[in-house]
UniProtKB/Swiss-Prot annotation:
Lineage summary: Bacteria, Thermotogati, Thermotogota, Thermotogae, Kosmotogales
Described purpose of this protein according to its UniProt entry: This protein binds to the 23S rRNA, and is important in its secondary structure. It is located near the subunit interface in the base of the L7/L12 stalk, and near the tRNA binding site of the peptidyltransferase center.
InterPro entries per the UniProt record, alphabetical: Ribosomal_uL6-like, Ribosomal_uL6-like_a/b-dom_sf, Ribosomal_uL6_a/b-dom, Ribosomal_uL6_bac-type
GO process annotations (BP): cytoplasmic translation
Gene Ontology CC annotation, any one: cytosolic large ribosomal subunit
UniProt-recorded Gene Ontology molecular function terms: rRNA binding; structural constituent of ribosome
Name the record gives this protein: Large ribosomal subunit protein uL6
Length: 184
C-alpha cells in the first residue's frame, strides 16, 4: 500500500477545495485548477485535510488491491501539486548556451534564435507566462505543474544540448555530460 495515503493533504488558509462526483476543484490566490479522478479512489475532505483512499467497492479479486493503492498514491500527489500550484505556483528555468543563440519576448510570444535559418516562435498556452530576464535565460511560470514542465520541455526540444560541445537549451543546473571528439 502507498505510504502517502496514510496521512492527509493539509489545506492552507485561503484555499478552497470542492469535491463533486469524480471532479476535484482547488481555488487559491493564484488561480483555480480542476482534476477528474477515476472511481478507483475516494477523495474526502475532513477537518485535518484531504484524504485519498482506495475505493474498496472496486475490489473484485485480491490482485485489485495493489492497483487501487497505486491509483491512490498517484491522486494523492496530483491533489498536493494542485494545492501547491494555486498557493505558490511552479516555475522552470532554462539556460541557452551557444554563440548567437538567444531568446526574446515579442508580446507574449517567445522568439528563439537557435542557429536555424528562421527564428522559432513559441506561443505559450493559457495559464503559462514566459519571462526572459536576459537573452540567455528563460523562465516558464504557471500554476499547473504538468503544463509548466511540458512547455519547458517543448522549448528545450528545439535545440537539445549537443554532447560534444554542450551548446543548446538546458534546464538550469542540468549537467550535460560531454564526450571527447575524434582525434585526427
Amino acid at each position: 500500500m502507498s505510504r502517502l495515503i496514510k496521512k492527509p493533504i493539509p489545506v492552507p488558509n485561503g484555499v478552497q477545495v470542492e469535491i463533486k462526483e469524480n471532479i476535484i476543484k482547488v481555488k487559491g490566490p493564484k488561480g483555480e485548477l480542476s482534476q477528474e479522478y477515476l472511481p478507483y479512489v475516494k477523495i474526502e475532505q475532513k477537518e485535518d485535510g484531504i484524504w485519498v483512499t482506495p475505493n474498496e467497492e472496486m475490489v473484485r479479486r485480491q490482485s485489485d488491491r495493489r492497483k487501487l493503492a497505486m491509483f491512490s498514491g498517484t491522486y494523492w500527489a496530483l491533489v498536493r501539486n494542485m494545492i501547491i500550484g494555486v498557493t505558490q505556483g511552479y516555475q522552470k528555468e532554462l539556460e541557452i548556451k551557444g554563440v548567437g543563440y538567444r531568446a526574446q519576448l515579442q508580446g507574449k510570444k517567445l522568439v528563439l534564435n537557435l542557429g536555424y535559418a528562421h527564428p522559432v516562435e513559441i506561443e505559450p498556452p493559457e495559464g503559462i507566462t514566459i519571462e526572459v530576464p536576459n537573452p540567455t535565460s528563460i523562465i516558464v511560470k504557471g500554476i499547473d505543474k504538468y503544463l509548466v514542465g511540458q512547455v519547458a520541455a517543448n522549448i528545450r526540444r528545439w535545440r537539445e544540448p549537443i554532447v560534444y560541445s554542450g551548446k543548446g537549451i538546458r534546464y538550469k543546473g542540468e549537467y550535460v555530460r560531454t564526450k571527447v571528439g575524434k582525434k585526427v
